[in-house]
Amino acid sequence: MHIYFCGSIRGGRQDVIIYQRIVQTLQKYGEVLTEHVSHSDLSERGEDAVQDGDKFIHDRDMEWLVMSDVIIAEVTQPSLGVGYELGSARGMRKKILCLFRPSSGKSLSAMVRGAVDGSLFQVRDYKEEEVEGILEEYFKGLSKD
């Protein structure tokens, strides 16, 4: 299974430790195409050393999005890029799970929470210690489909 993980890069790296925990868990269920999002050495500037910069990153990530079977997005830290990825994935009718931590004091965009349709697009509020269990439950549900 190809898994596309979304998390903030240029929007802020405050949650990178949580991203690492999520990606480590996701690797039990398949290949995480975007595991670099969880790397602590990736700064808010993103992948500076990439030849052709933003265009290369966009095209590569869109290719990975097309290849993916499921999208898991940590959406607590607002990110234009993650929003773009989610909108694109929804247009492709991909299975999407968004994870949001209310304890952050932030509010999740209505464009994300309002997209919930009960099957393809899901949003789960969570506490950090619950993330592995939520992902296990989600992937068990996928295997029944």
UniProtKB/Swiss-Prot annotation:
Any GO BP annotation: nucleoside salvage
Function: Part of a nucleotide salvage pathway that eliminates epigenetically modified 5-hydroxymethyl-dCMP (hmdCMP) in a two-step process entailing deamination to cytotoxic 5-hydroxymethyl-dUMP (hmdUMP), followed by its hydrolysis into 5-hydroxymethyluracil (hmU) and 2-deoxy-D-ribose 5-phosphate (deoxyribosephosphate). Catalyzes the second step in that pathway, the hydrolysis of the N-glycosidic bond in hmdUMP, degrading this cytotoxic nucleotide to avoid its genomic integration.
Reactions it catalyzes: 5-hydroxymethyl-dUMP + H2O = 5-hydroxymethyluracil + 2-deoxy-D-ribose 5-phosphate
Protein residues bound to 5-hydroxymethyl-dUMP: 7, 9-11, 79, 81, 85, 109
GO cellular component, one term: cytoplasm
Source domain of life: Eukaryota
Name recorded for this polypeptide: 5-hydroxymethyl-dUMP N-hydrolase
Family statement: Belongs to the 2'-deoxynucleoside 5'-phosphate N-hydrolase 1 family.
